[in-house]
Regions:
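Secretory-pathway/luminal and periplasmic proteins that interact with or process carbohydrate-rich
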Residues: 39-46, 126, 143-152
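Generic structural hydrophobic/aromatic packing signal, biased to beta-strands
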Residues: 34, 56-59, 138, 158
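Short, charged helix-capping/linker segments at alpha-helix termini
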Residues: 17-26
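Alpha-helical scaffolds flanking conserved acidic
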Residues: 25-33, 130-138
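Peptidoglycan-targeting cell-wall enzymes and recognition modules
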Residues: 1-13, 36-124
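Short secondary-structure capping/junction motifs at helix and strand boundaries
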Residues: 124-130
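Long, amphipathic alpha-helical surface segments
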Residues: 134-162
Length: 162
């Protein structure tokens, strides 16, 4: 597992580059805990199965392409901000494809953080404040009903490794 303080600092730095409203205490904690639960900050490729999900936040490439095409495309200022925060060429946002994003999500930690935050930003609800609220929010909007995770496992992982 990576050094917790360093991971939090990188998350803070990336989210600050996206803007103050993306870097609240709640956002930083939710993004940090999501990565912790998804990978323990150990795995860059989905363990077992087909290795579809990538990065510490276990984001599927199609999820990033969807976020770009159906969310960021309608928020060009935010799209530019995300590209800059992730240190990515604009072409990955103007013509996104899964192959490029598979590589980006495996190798670019700033892009992983930014896309995790964008994923949560799309949710039309306030960010959770408590660990239990985070666990349910993560399950409902990140891991989803189809995912193997549970709110109880989220809380357990954060208490054990966080």
């Amino acid at each position: 597992m990576l050094d917790k303080k360093q991971v939090r600092n990188v998350i803070n730095d990336v989210l600050q580059k996206m803007g103050e409203k993306y870097a609240s205490k709640e956002a930083i904690e939710l993004v940090y805990n999501t990565g912790l639960v998804e990978s323990k900050y150990v795995y860059l490729m989905q363990k077992g199965g087909n290795n579809v999900a990538r990065g510490f936040w276990q984001i599927e490439p199609w999820t990033s392409v969807d976020a770009i095409n159906n969310y960021l495309a309608y928020r060009p200022d935010l799209m530019k901000t995300v590209a800059k925060a992730a240190n990515l060429d604009w072409k990955y946002f103007t013509d996104p494809n899964e192959d490029d994003w598979r590589f980006i999500l495996t190798t670019n930690i700033a892009a992983q953080i930014a896309m995790c935050r964008v994923h949560y930003r799309r949710v039309p609800k306030r960010l959770p404040k408590t660990l239990d609220e985070q666990a349910n929010y993560w399950k409902d909007f990140y891991n989803t009903a189809k995912g193997a995770g549970t709110p109880e496992k989220f809380v357990e992982m954060v208490k054990k490794y966080g």
